């Protein structure tokens, strides 16, 4: 089945989106919502006409250096990692958390627990769940009680995804503290949430996007500034 949609921007600009086949990969895509339609359509991000790559902000080496610095900062801030655990926000946050875990193991000689939470606006059947992101799955095979939980995500934007992830952690127990580590902070917060560890701060406009790419999901490593 093929879907046809139009991505309606706040400015009222209509941008046609190419159809997405059933067999198309969802690994590098974009949810497009039709106001009043009650449905969301998943469309390949590179099929959206008018979205262009404006600049490459970080290459593979820069991403690696940023993650290593974040790993050192997490260990230093917490005076070691004996009581630290990592929780990645799927999908790229989970992958970044695993990389930070491996870095910390090389630095401190300890392998910290690492889990994930799945935060989304939509069910797999494309029906909108909520105006705010909700947690559909939490995979924590360890206790968070009296631990310092470090949430990991690729891009920090409004703060709503981070808030949903924090709520999921709190439902699993009472941690000593919750910290937030992100590869890129692009600003435009809608909630009073601030990252404790930031790989790179990138001020953006509302017509710009930050796209973090990882080989596990995108076939390459890098951070790109996209423009609508």
Locate predicted features.
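PRPP-associated nucleotide enzymes
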Residues: 2-9, 13-16, 25-228
């Amino acid at each position: 089945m093929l879907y046809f949609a139009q991505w309606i921007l706040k400015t009222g600009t209509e941008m046609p989106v190419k159809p997405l086949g059933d067999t198309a990969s969802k690994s590098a895509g974009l949810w497009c919502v039709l106001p009043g339609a009650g449905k969301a359509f998943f469309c390949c991000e590179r099929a959206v006409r008018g979205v262009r790559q404006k600049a490459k902000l970080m290459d593979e080496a820069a991403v690696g250096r940023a993650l290593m610095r974040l790993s050192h900062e997490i260990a230093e801030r917490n005076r070691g990692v004996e009581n630290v655990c990592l929780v990645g926000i799927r999908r790229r946050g989970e992958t970044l958390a695993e990389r930070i875990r491996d870095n910390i193991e090389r630095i401190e000689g300890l392998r910290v627990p690492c889990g994930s939470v799945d935060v989304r606006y939509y069910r797999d059947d494309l029906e909108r769940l909520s105006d705010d992101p909700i947690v559909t799955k939490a995979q924590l095979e360890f206790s968070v009680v009296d631990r310092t939980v470090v949430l990991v995500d690729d891009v920090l934007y409004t703060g709503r995804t981070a808030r949903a992830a924090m709520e999921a952690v709190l439902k699993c127990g009472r941690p000593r503290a919750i910290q937030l580590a992100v590869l890129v902070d692009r600003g435009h917060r809608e909630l009073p949430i601030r990252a404790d560890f930031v790989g790179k701060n990138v001020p953006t406009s509302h017509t710009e996007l930050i796209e973090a790419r990882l080989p596990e999901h995108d076939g390459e490593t890098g951070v790109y500034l996209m423009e609508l």
